[in-house]
Amino acid sequence: MKKRLIFTGLLALLFAACCFAQKPYKVVFYNLENFFDTINDPEVNDDEFTPEGPKKWNSVKYAKKLGNTEKVLFDIAGIDKDYPIVIGVSEVENRSVLEDIIATPKMAPGNYRISHYDSPEARGVDVAFMYRPDVFKLEGSAPIRTQIPSLPNFKTRDISTMWGTIDGEPFFFMVAHWPSRLGGKEASAPKRLA
């Protein structure tokens, strides 16, 4: 009985040591809420987010949104400036917007890299990753096309995937952003069944 108790105690200590030896890392998902640049892209339907469009989306509004995004992401890093190792985002127009985010003064020290693919979504809205290559060693990435058999002509955002290692351990990340409920829950349900 005494040997069993000692063995159980040692096993518990070993388990606790393994758990406490692991470094916690921050992984974040953030919906950028229609973060478009101000340039009209003839390949997508982004007219709403241009200086001439109904939202009058100009460089002043863009800079304000960029500053707000920088603040939110930096606040996640906290006082200790422990930047998230992976930030998955949705509702971003293109790589250029992501490059502006990681170049902001408060985010630049994180030395982020980008994993992004243009999706077939009509407005050009994508999902993407920003990651720290000093911690996450990227081995690969790929988009997964989202298809809805009952709506073959419906084009939506891809699912973005990336894989690699953290401290030699394999990790796989996915970020997805399903179609909205525009038109009501029942009317839009088939678009979210992918």
Task: Please place each PLM-identified region on the residue numbering.
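N-terminal, active-site-proximal structural segment of metallo-dependent hydrolase catalytic domains
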Residues: 20-105, 115-125
